[in-house]
Amino acid sequence: MRERGEMREAKAPLIAEAAEHISHSHGSGSSGTGSHTSGGGGGWRGSRQYQRRSDALAYGNRYQKAAALVDLAEDGVGIPEDVLNDTRFERAMRFYFVYLRLDWLWSLNLFALILLNFLEKPLWCRGYSQHACDQRDLYFLGQLPYLSKTESLIYEGLTLVILVMDIFYPLSYEGLNLFWKNTINKLKVLLLFILACDILVFAFSPQPFRVAPYIRVAFLIMNIRELRMCAVTLVGMVGTYLNVLALSLLFLLFASWLAYVTFEDTPQGKTVFSSYGTTLYQMFILFTTSNNPDVWVPAYKSSRWSSLFFIVYVLLGVYFLTNLILAVIYDSFKEQLAKQVSQADCTRKSILEKAFGIIDATGQGYLNKEQCLSLLDELNKYRSLPKTSREDFELIFAELDQSGDFKVTSEEFATLCNTIAIKFQKEPPPSYLEKYPSFYHSALCEWLKSFVRSPLFEYIVIFVLLMNLVAVIIETTLDIENSSSQKVWQEVEFVFGWIYVIEMALKIFSLGFGAYWMEGQNKFDFVLTWTIFIGETLTFAFPSKLSFLSNGEWIRYLLLGRMLRLTRILLQVRRFRAFVATFFTLMSSLMPYLGIVFCTLCIYCSLGLQIFGGIVYAGNPTLEETDLFSNDYLLFNFNDYPSGMVTLFNLLVMGNWQAWMESYRQLTGSYWSLIYFVSFYLISVLLLLNLIVAFVLEAFFAEMELEKDGEADIQDPTLEGRNRRRSVRVRTKGTMVDILLHHMLSNELDGSQNRDQ
């Protein structure tokens, strides 16, 4: 029995990196063929099997190397073309895969960098008094603890060391020349130097301003490929966005001048539109509808006909001009996104061409049938077909051989990525119990594994979830009524916790932990089940010794979270299946854009702390005259990072946002503070949120079309329909997002290809 290759590398990104090498990590390559190569396809079956792609690329024969490269291309690992053509391919790839396996460390360090922003003591505290930030009630501060200066320096020092390793490790497999060709690497080194200088200045001579919070966010964007692609896409559409903003500004200037002149001698002009600057300010807020109809109440009292002016303004500004802006910027966004996807496809194609060249060692320009079958057999160590017979491999070969001459050219070979996305699924590592075949493959174990994988087991779990839901409803109702019977139902919920642990154990036993962990639903169930089970066990075992656990409220929230598993019931209902599947796919595709919004909030939060930090405090006489005081918004301030992020979220959803803008203008005594809030609106709301809304709409329609195609395939009794049905079943989340993007951008990608030709 051939041993399956175990995929131990860190999970790679979805799409390969752009041709200009905008990547988090790079690999290296050459056209070496290894010492175990064979002729046209014979002799390869006796080759040594390798557990990792890195070992296969470094030591394997040419089919093993090519299979590893094809698997990298399908996983979306971006290897720069210059590295692929390097003569130190095998050696460099060993370092490259070590870097990938350390991805958990690099990711954890990025998380630590952002977390530091939330834990740092605000810089304004040192300007007031040594213990200013200890008076949390006085300054309406958040509840997160602050690090001392020494603790912050130690924290920053550790993250800086790991960041240095992350940035300079690629030198081991790229080499100095290729490393410095990459613009992103140059920018990383520059920002790293600035960050180190900022830490030194903070250590020996603290200043009221630091650049470190902004650099941390910049590293987050540059090191996460999806965020970097979004940032590059947004930068590419800046010119178009500025053009439509200029058009909007002209409309606003003209409408404000018209309003100022029209209502000059009326109560509206005397109380609200007292000057052109004030009129412009109020009309801008009306453009966002945040002060509608408050701003034109005086005019409406004087004459009902005056409402026509404001109605026309709102209709033109909000429902025409804003949507026009959205249409223009989204069209530009799709064009820029198509460029990123096209460049990623080119990089993926270059990796496939490298794999083709490794197999075609004699330079014939094509692969014969035996060579393709040898490659597919090696590739099956990374990806799994439902059947691994030679007949299945020949079907794949027939799909590759589009010309029907039993020769696969480089162009035909490039379609292998699409074939893999349809025919193959990731091969999970074998279960550890495979080491004991006499037990694991006994008749009883085989029956148990078959039962756990059957629909009947799934129906039983759903029934248990429904019973658990009833128990939670009864227990919470009794808790509200302070009934003594609540204790009994808490014990019933404890029994349900044991049932879920048994369910989890049976699934891991039947599937193996690797296959179990590949499902996102199983990850959610695993974490939630163990958290609830451990919490409930400690609560019952030590009800009085652990004061935190004695409060069962937090467990109740987790129990309610467990009920989210009932969404699987919706997947059993045909009319809901497409909507639920579309929702989860959209969530995956939206994460990079939501990440950009989060990074924008982080940057503005750091800026807000350094501009407005410390000016909202109890006893400030100016504060009592502001809308923050009258609306009881004092907790929503920029005195520390957590409070600032919550405040910016309120501004993001446009909930009475002019209250903060006007209040901070009064507190600072300067109209320049308005720039902060207006720019935040233009970037976060008018640009980013509108893009997200438009993206969701188009992605939803595209995904629904794909789901309908999938349902049609299920009804197709032909061989082609059965093959497509199988493809629907084995698609991974990354593949589904990739298919969704290509479907959405099909017109743009076709146009780009035609221009290239």
From Swiss-Prot:
GO terms for biological process: calcium ion transport; defense response. It holds the Pfam family Ion_trans. Expressed in shoot, mature leaf, cultured cells, and at lower level in roots. One of its GO terms (molecular function) is calcium ion binding. Residues 347-382, 388-423 form the EF-hand domain. The keyword Lyase does not apply. Rescues the Ca(2+) uptake activity in yeast mutant cch1. Plants overexpressing TPC1 display reduced growth rate and dwarf phenotype, and seedlings show greening of roots under light conditions. The highest overexpressor line shows most severe phenotype including a death symptom, possibly due to Ca(2+) accumulation to toxic level. Glycans are attached at residue 482. Residues 116-152, 210, 255-270, 286-308, 475-493, 545-553, 617-640, 656-676 are extracellular. Belongs to the calcium channel alpha-1 subunit (TC 1.A.1.11) family. Two pore calcium channel subfamily. Disulfide bonds: none annotated. Each of the two internal repeats contains five hydrophobic transmembrane segments (S1, S2, S3, S5, S6) and one positively charged transmembrane segment (S4). S4 segments probably represent the voltage-sensor and are characterized by a series of positively charged amino acids. The chain crosses the membrane at residues 95-115, 153-173, 189-209, 211-228, 234-254, 309-329, 454-474, 494-514, 524-544, 554-571, 596-616, 677-697. It comes from the Eukaryota. This is Two pore calcium channel protein 1. It is found in: Membrane. Homodimer. Keywords: Calcium, Calcium channel, Calcium transport, Glycoprotein, Ion channel, Ion transport, Membrane, Plant defense, Repeat, Transmembrane, Transmembrane helix, Transport, Voltage-gated channel. Residues 1-94, 174-188, 229-233, 330-453, 515-523, 572-595, 698-757 are cytoplasmic. SUPFAM superfamilies: EF-hand, Voltage-gated potassium channels. Residues 271-285, 641-655 dip into the membrane without crossing it.
